[in-house]
Each structure stands twice: as C-alpha cells, then as structure tokens.
Amino acid sequence: MNYENYIHNLFVDDEIFKYSINEIENQHEISFYIRFGSVLYNLNHDYGSIGLRKMVDYINSEINQDITLKEIKQIIKFFKLICHGMIISYKITFEYYKCLLKYDDIVFINSCIELADRNPLDLERFEEIVINKKNG
C-alpha cells in the first residue's frame, strides 16, 4: 500500500498535506542532529579535538559520508544551544538553525526561530532578516 497516497486522501488541501509531510521530515532531521550532537558533545568533552578528528575520519571512511570538522563543530554548537534553552521548531529545516549558530544570545536566537515559525520564509530571506534584526 502506498501510504503517501493514502495519507494524501485524508487531506482536502494539497498545501496542508505538503506542509505536514515537510514538518515530519524536519522533525526526523532535527531529531537526528540532536542525538548526533549529544554523542559529539560527549566525545568532545572526553577527548577534545583529537576525538572529533577521529570521528570525522571514522564517518568518512567507515560510514562513507562526507563530513568536515566544521560541520561536526556546527552540530556540537547546535546541541549546546539546545542545552542552554534554544527552542526547537519542526516548521524549519536544520539549514535555518545553521544561520543562527554564529550567535550566542539565546533570546535573540529564539526570537528568530519564532519569527520563522510564524512566517514561513525562504532561507535567503530568513538570513537577511536575521542580519538586519541583529544590526538594528
């Protein structure tokens, strides 16, 4: 049985269906990064950058996924921000969160997430608004 067609028939509006599917996909992606961030955070805490470099090598060679040390550090920062009170919205993708990783002000970050949560914006427009909001 094609569950996507079955689920689609439950919805009258195509936009609601697409929105719901996107939210489920975002939830899976963000949940993965939270769990992965937890592992990386502990690895970094216990072994420092040597452990992170070994993790990068392991992922690239054994799991056959291209990942850089920079991406690993972004995921750790994402996890740390959650630990310090950053809210999670499944209405936006991880790419939106990556725009906010350069900031440390949780109140500012949460206000940006709430803005994106209320008003769906494309990523480029979101980045513009974040920069303008921070500067003025």
Predicted regions, residues:
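Generic detector of bulky aromatic hydrophobic side chains
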Residues: 9, 77, 111-113
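Basic, low-complexity segments
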Residues: 1-27
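Alpha-helical structural elements
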Residues: 1, 91-92, 121
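Short, Lys/Arg-enriched phosphate-binding patches
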Residues: 17-107
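Helix-turn-helix/homeodomain-like alpha-helical modules used for DNA recognition
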Residues: 106-136
